[in-house]
A protein has these predicted regions:
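N-terminal targeting signals for export/organelle localization
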Residues: 1-41, 45
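A short beta-strand-turn-helix
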Residues: 41-61
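Alpha/beta-hydrolase fold active-site loops
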Residues: 61-62, 141
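Aromatic-flanked redox-active Cys/Sec active sites in thiol-based oxidoreductases
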Residues: 65-70, 100
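Thiol/disulfide oxidoreductase modules built on the thioredoxin-like
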Residues: 112-115, 123-170
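Conserved hydrophobic/aromatic "anchor" residues
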Residues: 42, 66-67, 109, 117
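C-type cytochrome heme c attachment motif
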Residues: 69-76, 142
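Structural microenvironment flanking redox-active thiols in thiol-disulfide oxidoreductases
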Residues: 75-114, 124-130
């Protein structure tokens, strides 16, 4: 094969790869924007049974944590989230727990751990919302951080580790 032809084939392959990566990233970005809009508009209920939407906290950095009382890693990370809500001014950062569980179990669990941030109750449709936000497996815990404008800044499947949330929030609070 002539050197010119070989270089052209390599450049063509690189171009196709770059186009595919761009399309994949674009699809993920669109999926994240759609998922964020749906998350903000989704009608949850609070522990008193009143309808609540996350859009009420738009303008703040939001840490939306999907969890369940039966999920061991979820239970382990809750003290970290309680500490984070105490550390950060609620005027700037709002942590919201979205329980995929029965309200009575969430109420009981919340009183045991003295959870200080708002807890909302989700139905099974929350799994679809999580999938739109990139959690294809629907696993828990799943944390979505939204910037002040309501766009997805970060997602994390699995329990947050100490200090990890600080690293995620730091650039959003500048």
């Amino acid at each position: 094969m002539r050197p010119g032809r070989r270089e052209a084939l390599i450049l063509g392959a690189v171009g196709v790869g770059a186009a595919a990566a761009g399309a994949l990233f674009g699809a993920f970005a669109l999926q994240s924007r759609t998922g964020a809009a749906e998350l903000l508009a989704h009608a949850f209920v609070d522990l008193a049974g009143k309808p609540r939407r996350l859009v009420q906290w738009k303008g703040k950095v939001m840490v939306c944590n999907f969890w369940a009382t039966w999920c061991a890693p979820c239970r382990e990370e809750i003290p970290l989230l309680i500490a984070a809500q105490q550390q950060y001014d609620a005027k700037i950062v709002q942590i919201v727990g979205i329980g995929i569980d029965h309200a009575d179990k969430i109420v009981e669990f919340s009183s045991q751990l003295k959870i200080t941030y708002p807890l909302l109750v989700a139905d099974a449709s929350a799994v679809d919302t999580m999938k739109q936000l990139g959690n294809r497996s629907g696993g828990l815990p799943f944390t979505v951080v939204l910037d002040r404008g309501g766009a997805v800044a970060s997602t994390k499947l699995g329990a947050l580790k100490p200090g990890e949330l600080d690293l995620i929030l730091a650039p959003l609070l500048r």
